């Protein structure tokens, strides 16, 4: 083999080696490009998931803010809630009607009153309409010393009226807070005349005369809920005076005092009427 032939074959081998290297580099480049594209997809997916997570966090903060606002506005704080659903079997005559029975359970409080509710809602859906009714309602409330609430809860259960329950309980608690603050105000203003034997949460306030020992007035302030769930205050005046004073009361002032007090309430309102009565009874005309 002459020198030219050897040189030609050496060049062909070198070209073949270079071609193999080029193919290897091309394959590596394709793999790198594929890896880069995969990385871009993963990065894009991670970015989208991160944005979605940020949106969820933002929505959660918004819901927490709304929940806090509604709790402050209404006074209700719901602590626990659960729900179950059962599809109700329907008869042949109701085959076009879908019925779902929802069982709800929740507990919470409205200021000092705690409650537990269990109720069932039957949802009925046809081609024309969708409706729902409460089929059962059970209410447990504490503290139980509020006799008005016990009677009210029984009526709400009978009527299966959740809206009435929440609305009436809200206003009942508002009136209780107002009564407590009013009693506290007069106790601080007239400490030697006003007595709250059961504290500011009591429904009774005693007014004792500092000039005539044995003369007392008792304000009985009840908060009532009627059959329709309307909440309103009911204030009565009781008198405690010595028997001898009753015999000397020719103008029947003591006897007619409760009726006169109700008239005073209608003219002046609760706080002004109580203040006027206390000043009159204690001899404080300032």
From Swiss-Prot:
Highest taxon, organism lineage: Eukaryota
Coiled-coil blocks: 1-73
Residues with Phosphoserine modification: 38
Gene Ontology CC terms: inner kinetochore; nucleolus; nucleoplasm; nucleus
PANTHER family assigned to the protein according to its UniProt record, in alphabetical order: CENTROMERE PROTEIN P
Quaternary structure note: Component of the CENPA-CAD complex, composed of CENPI, CENPK, CENPL, CENPO, CENPP, CENPQ, CENPR and CENPS. The CENPA-CAD complex interacts with the CENPA-NAC complex, at least composed of CENPA, CENPC, CENPH, CENPM, CENPN, CENPT and CENPU.
Family, similarity comment: Belongs to the CENP-P/CTF19 family.
Protein name: Centromere protein P
Organism listed in the record: Mus musculus
